[in-house]
A protein has these predicted regions:
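Iron-sulfur-associated redox domains of electron-transfer enzymes in respiratory
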Residues: 1-205
């Protein structure tokens, strides 16, 4: 899991486009927050064998206005990456911005947007008691950072990803994906330092 986005994606027109692709028998991999996945299923009103859905473990979604203020502060118009891992998962660098055609990396200690986000101060009220924050996941596959288990920083300097196959459909996709290095784990390890897998913000705070 790389290049996380701490803002909700714009889904305008995307559900209609996905339906068109599915009706033409194209394979579709749709990723988003759990509520976006649920929204897609609600729009389609049926399941397609050639549709695969992937959700992130969501920490709540800030509004667009907060991001716009962040960009204005740094006189930037574009965020290239929210999680720069050139020097590893645990380096101090964090956000990469584009400013006047050049790139600027903002250290984590100077990234106010990230600090406020990590403190759960930017999330929408609708996220505070999210019904999708449950071990009964809505998508075929769930992804996130893997903070639990026995892995050492030195083994995987850019971090370890968590992949959960929530149903047979998702499991079959992972089995077919031959270029992944997969190691088995347990739900107990998965939820270590990842409470949003099963708790909404109101229960965490």
């Amino acid at each position: 899991l790389m290049n996380s986005k701490y803002i909700q994606s714009d889904t305008k027109g995307i559900y209609q486009y996905v339906k068109q692709l599915l009706q033409s028998n194209a394979y579709v991999l749709f990723s988003g927050t759990p509520c976006q996945i649920a929204g897609l299923y609600g729009y389609l009103r049926k399941r397609y064998d050639h549709l695969y859905t992937v959700e992130i473990i969501c920490h709540g979604i800030p509004g667009q206005e907060a991001l716009d203020l962040h960009l204005t502060h740094f006189k930037s118009t574009k965020i290239i990456s929210f999680r720069e891992k050139e020097y590893g998962q645990y380096a101090s660098q964090h956000t990469t911005l584009e400013i006047n055609g050049d790139t600027k990396v903002i250290a984590r200690k100077d990234d106010l947007f990230y600090k406020i986000f990590a403190g759960w101060l930017l999330d929408r009220k609708s996220c505070s008691n999210c019904k999708y924050a449950s071990l009964n996941r809505v998508s075929d596959i769930t992804i996130a950072d893997f903070w639990g288990g026995h892995y050492k920083k030195e083994q995987f300097e850019k971090g370890v990803s968590l992949l959960i196959a929530n149903n047979e459909h998702g499991h079959n996709l992972l089995v077919k994906t031959s270029n992944l290095q997969l190691n088995p784990s347990t739900i107990k390890e998965a939820i270590n330092s990842n409470p949003n897998l099963y708790l909404s913000l109101i229960h965490i705070s």
